[in-house]
């Protein structure tokens, strides 16, 4: 699949080949869902904790005798029914992370790349560039040629360019990711996806193995 390549000024300068085995496969929505669920689960800290009736502070003495008072029978004021009592079936610290099969993860990445590549308006390929000044305004001027800032924007790099990443730190809703450190959730929810030529070439090689 051929796609137009633009200069950083927004002018068309050529074309690039998007490998059909990566950018034009039958989309597996199930694998995308499972990958996003896995990524978000792995981010959870899992530190929520409540006290049971055995852990909450207070006496275990029976508040009143079992019979003869006319009131409901109670064994302890730490009863979950009472205010200040323990919590029944409340959360405890746990690890929410789990591993996703490699084949499912790989299929999810290729599916989401194919989904994004199908829309030429939100997926742009531009020439390789660097922001030597490391200044936010210089990067913002380039991005404005391809995307508006009223939604999430993701830039895909072919290498770990620290100057571009530095320039993008102060731009809201912008994520700058290396081709080998992508997340399906970022690609799926981005309003605009900007890929450098080097990133496309690396993705072509990386996901056809």
UniProtKB/Swiss-Prot annotation:
Protein name: Large ribosomal subunit protein uL4
Residue numbers spanned by region Disordered: 47-72
InterPro entries: Ribosomal_uL4 (IPR002136), Ribosomal_uL4-like (IPR013005), Ribosomal_uL4_dom_sf (IPR023574)
Xref: NCBIfam families: rplD_bact (TIGR03953)
Keywords noted in UniProt: Ribonucleoprotein, Ribosomal protein, RNA-binding, rRNA-binding
Assembly, per entry: Part of the 50S ribosomal subunit.
SUPFAM superfamilies: Ribosomal protein L4
GO molecular-function term, one example from the UniProt record: rRNA binding
Compositional bias (Basic residues): 59-72
One Pfam match: Ribosomal_L4
Keyword Ribosomal protein found: yes
Record's function text: One of the primary rRNA binding proteins, this protein initially binds near the 5'-end of the 23S rRNA. It is important during the early stages of 50S assembly. It makes multiple contacts with different domains of the 23S rRNA in the assembled 50S subunit and ribosome. Forms part of the polypeptide exit tunnel.
Span of the signal peptide: none
PANTHER family: 50S RIBOSOMAL PROTEIN L4, LARGE RIBOSOMAL SUBUNIT PROTEIN UL4M
GO biological process, one term: translation
Family membership noted in the UniProt record: Belongs to the universal ribosomal protein uL4 family.
Entry superkingdom: Bacteria
One GO term describing the cellular component: ribosome
């Amino acid at each position: 699949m051929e796609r137009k390549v633009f200069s950083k000024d927004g002018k068309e300068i050529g074309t690039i080949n998007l490998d059909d085995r990566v950018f034009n496969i039958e989309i597996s929505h199930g694998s995308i869902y499972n990958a996003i669920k896995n990524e978000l689960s792995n981010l959870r800290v899992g530190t929520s904790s409540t006290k049971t009736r055995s852990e909450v502070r207070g006496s275990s003495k029976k508040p009143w005798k079992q019979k003869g008072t006319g009131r409901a029978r109670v064994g302890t004021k730490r009863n979950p029914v009472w205010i200040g009592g323990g919590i029944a079936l409340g959360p405890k610290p746990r690890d929410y992370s789990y591993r996703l099969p490699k084949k499912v993860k790989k299929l999810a990445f290729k599916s989401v790349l194919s989904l994004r590549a199908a829309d030429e308006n939100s997926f742009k390929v531009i020439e390789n560039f660097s922001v030597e000044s490391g200044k936010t305004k210089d990067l913002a001027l380039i991005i404005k040629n391809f995307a508006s800032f009223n939604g999430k924007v993701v830039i895909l790099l072919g290498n770990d360019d620290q100057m571009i990443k530095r320039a993008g730190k102060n731009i809201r809703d912008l994520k700058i990711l290396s081709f080998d450190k992508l997340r399906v959730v970022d690609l799926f929810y981005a309003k605009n996806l900007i890929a450098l030529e080097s990133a496309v070439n690396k993705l072509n090689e990386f996901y056809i193995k």
